[in-house]
Amino acid sequence: MPIAVLALGITQITAWGTSFYCLGVLAGPISQDTHWSRGFVFLGFTVALLVMGVVSSAVGRTIDRRGARVVMTLGSVLVAGGLFALAHVHSEPAYLAVWAFLGVGMRMCLYDAAFAALVQVAPSRGRTAISYLTLFGAFASSVFWVVGHALNQRVGWRQTLVLFAFMNLAVCLPLHWLGLSRREAPRGEATPTGGPAPSREDPPLEGRTRSRAIVLFALVMSLNGFVFGVVSVQLVPLLEAAGLATAAAVWVASLKGVAQFGGRVVEMLFGRKLRAITVARIAVGVLPPSLLLLMVGPASLSLVVAFTLLMGASQGVITIVRGAVPLALFGSKDYGAVLGAIATPVLIVNAASPSLFAWITDRWGWGTGRMSLLAGAALAWLAMEIMSHWYEARHREGVSASPAHATATPRRRDARPR
């Protein structure tokens, strides 16, 4: 597993940085060179997210059938081809079409595919591997915004995208193919005494119960996706509307990445002692109070910093939860298809949320906009609590009805080992 985590860690930094985050530093140069509005430039990214949502279930099923190794390797080829094509577009329709093509490749390369790959490579250690992998991903924007800015200064945005395409072929493609070539047989994690460790999670859900749980968890992630979709694009304007000057808003917004990384480290150190669904309840539950900090009166720097740190930590842990909870509730069987089904509404909401939030603030102001974020976070928390209590009740019913529970008898006091 360490080889797979390291390989995927490198590819996640590269794939996220060169595709998902590339407009962070290249949108301005593209707009200036082509005379397209920045809004139109970012519309391409919205198209990619929508396509990712549309193809998500199909990609997930293909990962289960063909293996993540094949899908992610092909995804590297598609991302490279899309970036190369993007470097040569000169018309608006072609620009949007290339982003649609990139959306397919991105869905085959980014977190959901990588989570499924780790579960296929190391079924017994999937949750731990997912936690480690997200630590790598936290550096993607930091690394490639610097790299992209430097390359654009030297060779321009078109050649920068060509170099990004080459990185996907030279780095991601071989690492996906070679790093995912070995799988361990499913087994329990070893204890210090050498025996299998008892599972911290309950048996996977089946049948109608499984379907209902998938719908509930997809609802939780979609409601959170609305909040994080807005924050990812409009955090600086949100902080400015709270009363910060632009320079201060940019500085505070930069703390979000630090908080994401910190949240993931805390989950790795302490979250292993908790069930995945418990970690999810904590991460989802932190978000509404953090948003309240923006609404308690005149904003102070300390309150805004506290909001950013809590929100960032929540987002960082929820990235892990998105892969760990389905593994705990539904098991490794058809894991790729389950992630694909959950990701479909999440990605579509992510794509639509910045525009929807902009419409809300333009029509009713920033106060109503903040209320919409709080409502989304509160509904996500409520849905998470309903899901958790429902799941616990179903589990207790299953345990009390199980033959082992009904027929178990205590060992006689006078029994002797033979």
Where are the regions that the model predicts?
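C-terminal transmembrane helical hairpin of 12-TM major facilitator-type secondary transporters
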Residues: 256, 274-325
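Intracellular juxtamembrane helix-capping segments at the cytosolic ends
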Residues: 30, 108-122, 317-330
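Helix-to-loop junctions at the C-terminal end of transmembrane segments
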Residues: 55-67, 263-276, 361-362
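Conserved MFS/SLC helix-loop-helix module at the cytosolic interface between two early adjacent transmembrane helices
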Residues: 54-92
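Interfacial helix-cap and linker-helix signal at transmembrane-aqueous boundaries
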Residues: 30-31, 62-63, 146-155, 239-240, ...
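Extracytoplasmic gate region of multi-pass secondary transporters
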Residues: 23-27, 210-262
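Symmetry-related core transmembrane helices of the 12-TM Major Facilitator Superfamily/SLC fold
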Residues: 159-178, 370-388
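Hydrophobic core of transmembrane alpha-helices in multi-pass small-molecule transporters
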Residues: 13, 82, 93-109, 222, ...
